[in-house]
Regions:
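Flavin-dependent oxidoreductase catalytic core characteristic
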Residues: 3-387, 391-400
Length: 400
């Protein structure tokens, strides 16, 4: 136990975790900006390659499947840019609680940024692996972003849990107030339910929730404002998707009950939908600003087409996520995973690399071979002597 003087506290007592988590907000934004820069460079490089590389006497950009990748790269880079601009604006405004938003931005940027760079590699083919074309470094570096600053699997669960906290509390409150409790006798149950039924504050929450959960009646669409008039059809589509997400989130929570806490596939679908809705909102905002500013030219036309294409793709993704809440392959997935795990357990640990932190097999795995990896002389540190060493003296050479 470490005693910290009051004068050295960074915040109020008991708020240490909140301070630590808040620091992650900045890291997730700077990480996302790095992804965006690499994705934009990859987009432009691959698109230029597709225009100048010919196959069958035609540029690659003439082919549908290449055009699909070009459009997707443009759409995702525009969406990442829009989301990051909105996110950094929240930081500059000193908004107090934006952990969900920064987590969503990190997940979206790392997933879609990776897709952009992967598409660029596919367009450039084997040339993409050539160091001189400056894409292979971006391809290698981009993969780590889905792991660092919170692995995306963890972030999906975080967005689900933290973002859905208010809904969960509301549903639990209504259930406690109006549902039958087996721990109470019948008279206590009736008395509690009648008393709460006469409470306007409780019924104002219980009736709309009951209409959705019991009668499956969807609520009204939310009102979206501030967009450019030309984008009203897209704002209406976004409002409908927000309503559908809220409705099916409630139904999924009722269907899975307490099991939803451990079913990460369901959590990921709900989180991914919320993240795409956030991205669509950011895209709508950015495109509205461009239209109001009277931006023109080929770059704007590219941005406008990319934004509208992203809306189409995001809508398809959201509808698929909603459909998969009820019809999916989760059961066979768990069975297949269990069978694969059971088989792997029969294989000797000595044939495989095992985590040094494994509580069950540390030290039993295959030894790592490092002869082919360049090592610094002098062990783990590069010894520079008196500071007057020549280049030859500090040249990195592989071990014999």
């Amino acid at each position: 136990n470490v005693k910290v003087p009051v004068a050295n506290r960074l915040h109020k007592e008991g708020k240490g975790l909140n301070v630590a988590l808040t620091c992650l907000n900045y890291g997730r934004c700077t990480l996302s900006s790095g992804i965006l820069g690499a994705a934009k460079k990859a987009r432009d490089q691959a698109t230029k390659w597709a225009r100048t590389r010919y196959q069958f006497n035609r540029p690659l950009s003439d082919f549908d499947l290449v055009q699909e990748k070009i459009a997707r790269m443009a759409a995702y880079t525009y969406a990442i840019d829009a989301m990051l601009y909105m996110m950094t604006g929240m930081l500059d405004r000193h908004d107090s609680d934006i952990m969900v938003e920064t987590a969503a931005a990190k997940v979206f940027a790392s997933e879609m940024g990776w897709q952009v760079i992967d598409d660029a590699m596919q367009i450039m083919g084997g040339e993409g692996y050539m160091t001189e074309n400056e894409l292979e470094r971006a391809f290698r570096d981009a993969r780590i972003y889905r792991i660092v600053e919170g692995a995306n699997e963890v972030m999906w669960s975080f967005v689900f849990a933290y973002g859905g906290k208010q809904l969960a509390e509301q549903m639990l409150g209504v259930q406690t107030a109006m549902f039958y409790d087996t721990d109470e006798n019948p008279f206590e149950n009736i008395g509690r339910m009648v008393t709460n039924a006469l409470n306007p504050a409780i019924m104002s929450r219980a009736i709309p929730l009951g209409l959705q959960l019991v009668l499956r009646i969807k609520p009204k669409k939310p009102v979206i404002s501030g967009y450019h008039p030309d984008l009203r059809p897209f704002a209406d589509r976004l409002a409908k998707l927000v309503r559908d997400h809220s409705h099916w989130f409630k139904l999924a929570s009722m269907k899975n009950k307490e099991h939803i806490v451990t079913r990460q596939t369901i959590q990921a679908r709900i989180s991914d939908t919320a993240i795409h809705l956030f991205a669509m909102s950011a895209v709508l905002s950015k495109l509205s600003a461009q239209l109001r500013a009277g931006v023109r030219g080929t770059e704007f036309l590219r941005d406008q087409a990319a934004a509208l294409h992203f809306f189409e793709m995001a809508e398809l993704t959201i509808n698929e996520n909603i459909r998969a809440l009820n019809k999916n392959a989760d059961r066979s997935m768990r069975e297949a995973a269990k069978a694969a795990i059971d088989h792997t357990d029969t294989l000797s640990d000595g044939k495989f690399y095992i985590s040094e932190r494994s509580p069950v097999s540390a030290g039993n795995g295959r030894a790592t071979e490092q002869q082919h990896i360049k090592q610094f002389p002098g062990g783990s540190q590069l010894e520079m002597g008196d500071g007057r060493s020549t280049d030859a003296e500090v040249e990195v050479k592989p071990r014999a």
